[in-house]
Amino acid sequence: MRVNYIFVTGGVVSSLGKGIATASLAAVLEARGLSVTIIKLDPYINMDPGTISPVQHGEVFITEDGAETDLDLGHYERFIRTKMRHHNNFTAGKIYADVLRKERRGDYLGATIQIIPHVTDTIKKWLIAGAFGHDVLLVEIGGTVGDIESLPFLEAIRQMVMEVNREQTLYIHLTLVPFIAVSGELKTKPTQHSVKELLSIGIQPDILICRSDRVISNSERKKISLFCNVPKQAIIALQDVDSIYKIPALLKDQGLDNYICKRFNLNCPEANLSDWEEVIYYQEHPIGEVTVGMVGKYIELVDAYKSVTEALKHAGIKNRFIVNIRLINSQDVEKLGIEKTLKGLDAILVPGGFGYRGVEGKILSAQYARENNIPYFGICLGMQVALIEFARHVAGMPEANSTEFVTNCKCPVIALITECKDENGIFITHNDNTNLGGTMRLGNQACYLIKGSLTHQIYGKSTILERHRHRYEVNNMLLKHITHAGLSCVGFSKKNNLVEVIEYPNHPWFIGSQFHPEFNSTPREGHPLFIGFIKAAIEYQHRHNKLI
């Protein structure tokens, strides 16, 4: 099967939106009936982003097979139907580790190990393997052309021409065309210099995607075409839009998919973007709006909760409501109090996280939602703080806590997987080798829902598959005291020994999930839990307005 390769690089500045542009192009090609996948190459030395601070790097996106990957893979899954896996994200650290492992084994037979050919050959081998079974592979190279870290990756994609033929490769370069207010002009010089930098590496871009905050005129496109040696029809203008889900249509309207299909000699029907047109229609024709408070500790960088914020927007689209997300620092809840931080919300969501900082603010948020019948959705740590709060204030366990926060906790309602006991005080059979990542539960896990529960009603089925990323669990030894006080455990892992979902029946909508449903939400389908959560927020708003 012939595979065609599209390599996407970026220039001038970082954070131009290569990931979204790549995903949007993939969506248009997929809409033409092509089988498409995407690989992200990250130039940092970390093995994966799993241990990088969310404030520095953004969220860690978890794939079905449990890989901790770059947040761009979340964009890919939201735009195309192909599911990402561990081979869809490679870092420089992972590449170097593989090369060094082979060197220690003697695979190179005493050769001097160098960037060229050993590192570049490994990159090419992994790209070709990742493309297997697809019509088109798009490869996004992280970083900016000119960065020293990106050079091995750029050299590898330059060499791909000789590996798979020039007719099967295409280079797209994403650049910035800034508007200079003083002169009132868009400037093409940064794009020209960026292409010159790329040419010095040996790569002539076939297509330029020019980012700008306004429409790029015909004369400016001609100028870029002349100085960058790229055909005018291959100069794509990508101006700022109010919704990223409009970008597939923007690319199609400029004929980018036709140009690519012609270049690859692909005979396929016109792109059918009716799904995306429906998404945009509902997004632009809301019948109301609600405000959701998201209480977290990494709110200074919105990308730290990217999948959660997108899932809330998807649920808004499905309910035809605008979802206004108020980012609330959980430490502010502790310091400033509920009146100044949580008032005026239609729903409260506490997302996942690690560490003790800000936890008491999250517990206060769960308590406020429970006592005031405000819809509450706790994800991962958000479920755990809801359980701790209930244990302290309803189940008569004032010292309830997690061993993550208090090592010698007298009442450990949450504990490490290896510390958890069943209701008879016997350790649950988990060890460092039980799950991928040692004691970390990662990736898809089966969950069984109790019939008659709200969560079962929302999903409409008894068995679900959701993605996990955590190492602390509900301690079953203390669970009876909590459930006798009124909290329901309605979702369990495969062996029924790990709590996956909790509910508070004496509340309109109070759900906590140990898994991360946000990773399975897409703009076209949404996710049942998020859709139900926003529906509950709408109903709360209506009830609240009637009382006023």
UniProtKB/Swiss-Prot annotation:
Q: What class of enzyme is it?
A: ligase
Every Glutamine amidotransferase type-1 domain range? 291-543
Which GO BP terms, alphabetically?
Answer: 'de novo' CTP biosynthetic process; pyrimidine nucleobase biosynthetic process
How would you summarize its activity regulation?
Allosterically activated by GTP, when glutamine is the substrate; GTP has no effect on the reaction when ammonia is the substrate. The allosteric effector GTP functions by stabilizing the protein conformation that binds the tetrahedral intermediate(s) formed during glutamine hydrolysis. Inhibited by the product CTP, via allosteric rather than competitive inhibition.
Question: What are the GO MF terms of this UniProt record?
Answer: ATP binding; CTP synthase activity; glutaminase activity; identical protein binding; metal ion binding
What are the protein's UniProt keywords? ATP-binding, Glutamine amidotransferase, Ligase, Magnesium, Metal-binding, Nucleotide-binding, Pyrimidine biosynthesis
Which residues are noted in the entry as ATP-binding? S15, L16, G17, K18, G19, I20, D72
Part of which pathway? Answer: Pyrimidine metabolism; CTP biosynthesis via de novo pathway; CTP from UDP: step 2/2
| Region of interest: Amidoligase domain | 1-266
Q: What is annotated as the active site?
A: C380 (nucleophile), H516, E518
EC number assigned by the record: 6.3.4.2
**Domain of life per record:** Bacteria
Record-listed Mg(2+) binding positions:
D72, E140
Q: Which residues bind UTP?
A: S14, K187, T188, K189, P190, T191, Q192, K223
SUPFAM superfamilies of this UniProt entry? Class I glutamine amidotransferase-like, P-loop containing nucleoside triphosphate hydrolases
Which CDD domains does this entry report, sorted A to Z?
Answer: CTPS_N, GATase1_CTP_Synthase
Q: GO cellular component terms?
A: cytosol
Question: What is the stated purpose of this protein?
Answer: Catalyzes the ATP-dependent amination of UTP to CTP with either L-glutamine or ammonia as the source of nitrogen. Regulates intracellular CTP levels through interactions with the four ribonucleotide triphosphates.
Please state which protein family the record places this protein in: Belongs to the CTP synthase family.
Q: Which HAMAP family match?
A: PyrG
Its UniProt miscellaneous note says: CTPSs have evolved a hybrid strategy for distinguishing between UTP and CTP. The overlapping regions of the product feedback inhibitory and substrate sites recognize a common feature in both compounds, the triphosphate moiety. To differentiate isosteric substrate and product pyrimidine rings, an additional pocket far from the expected kinase/ligase catalytic site, specifically recognizes the cytosine and ribose portions of the product inhibitor.
Q: What is this protein called?
A: CTP synthase
Say which species the protein is native to: Blochmanniella pennsylvanica (strain BPEN)
Its ancestry begins with: Bacteria, Pseudomonadati, Pseudomonadota, Gammaproteobacteria, Enterobacterales
